[in-house]
Regions:
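Single conserved hydrophobic/aromatic residue that forms the stacking wall/gate
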Residues: 1-10
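Extended, domain-scale alpha-helical bundle/helix-rich regions
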Residues: 114, 157-164
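Short Cys/His-rich metal-coordination motifs, predominantly Zn2+-binding knuckles/fingers
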Residues: 173
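Residues forming anionic-ligand binding surfaces in small-molecule and nucleic-acid pockets
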Residues: 37, 42, 47, 75-113, ...
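Conserved alpha/beta enzyme-core scaffolds, especially Rossmann-like or related mixed alpha/beta domains
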Residues: 96-150
């Protein structure tokens, strides 16, 4: 279902290694910025290694070797692979576990405009996938990019009574966001000044009562 749904937006399926040299993560800075969720170990020669929780670093390394020509962009790849993340509180069956199967995708562009157009195309592809799967309770919300970084991020939330996250939904403007990314915009309402007039206010002791 995923491969069919993503066929129009991702043309290349790859399979990155689960075990990666720590040097890739040290170069990006995430080796130090990510906490204990990243599983680290050393091989028999003492070289530091990691178990992939995501593969941004590996994708960049691939493009370094492959994407030397301008004509090869935009460049999109995806994989469906086992990930490892040392969760502090594994729970809820398949909702949050240390080992899981995830579809992750990476794209590379020559302009911000091309990236934004492609992001919207991918977002619509996921909406079609959930619709085909018959999961109407899924909603797309604005989210915080977190350790992944980036300026724009959305996540698809499955509405369930056992969920732990809260989301904000505006029925008037269709704004949706999780609590980490939600923004509150207060508009100042102004009215024309009116002339002062005397008002009879018997048995009223506060401004609220007069209003």
């Amino acid at each position: 279902l995923l491969s069919r749904g993503l066929g129009d937006v991702y043309k290349r399926q790859v399979q990155f290694p689960v075990v990666m040299p720590a040097s890739l993560w040290q170069e990006s800075g995430r080796y130090d910025s990510i906490g204990k969720e990243l599983l680290r170990f050393t091989d028999r020669n003492g070289a530091p290694m990691v178990l992939g929780m995501t593969h941004e670093e590996a994708a960049v390394q691939l493009v370094r070797e492959y994407g030397q020509s301008y004509a090869k962009y935009p460049f999109m790849i995806y994989q469906i692979q086992t990930k490892f993340r040392d969760e502090a509180r594994p729970r809820a069956g398949l909702i949050r576990v240390r080992e899981f199967t995830m579809k992750d995708a990476y794209s590379f562009h020559t302009s911000q405009e091309d990236l934004e157009q492609y992001y919207d195309k991918c977002h619509k592809a996921y909406e079609r996938i959930y619709a085909r799967a018959g999961i109407p309770e899924v909603v797309s919300v604005k989210s915080d990019s977190g350790m992944m970084g980036g300026n724009v991020s959305h996540e698809f939330m499955l509405l369930t009574p056992i969920g732990e996250d809260s989301i904000v939904i505006c029925n008037e403007c269709d704004y949706r966001a999780n609590m980490e990314a939600a923004e509150n915009i207060v508009e100042n309402e102004t009215e024309a000044m009116q002339e002062l007039t005397k008002v009879h206010t018997p048995e009223m002791h506060t401004i609220e009562q007069v209003c």
